[in-house]
Amino acid sequence: DLRESPALVVIKHLIDEGAKIQAWDPAIKEHHAAIPQQVELGESPIAVCRGAEVLVVLTEWDEFGLLDAEVIAREMDRLAVVDTRNVLNRKDWQAAGFVHQGIGR
């Protein structure tokens, strides 16, 4: 049940501000109906980073902590990441050239 999901609150706010949202979540098929229609769902975390200006991590899936910052850097237009769950290794992402903002650090 995603009705009170903090991630959806952030996504809806970003859409209201004019952002184009590409999203990936390993459990998205179970909750597809709750996702705003403006959100483009991708097949993988790498796919949704192609051409992105900012990577925003809103959930704590283990898969996000395993992302290779160097691989993601080659896909994105700008190297900026906001990690709201602190699942990414800050040093690895900064070493790959990212401006990394963790929330709560």
Report the location of each language-model feature.
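Structural/interface elements that position substrates and couple domains in central-metabolism enzymes
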Residues: D1-R105
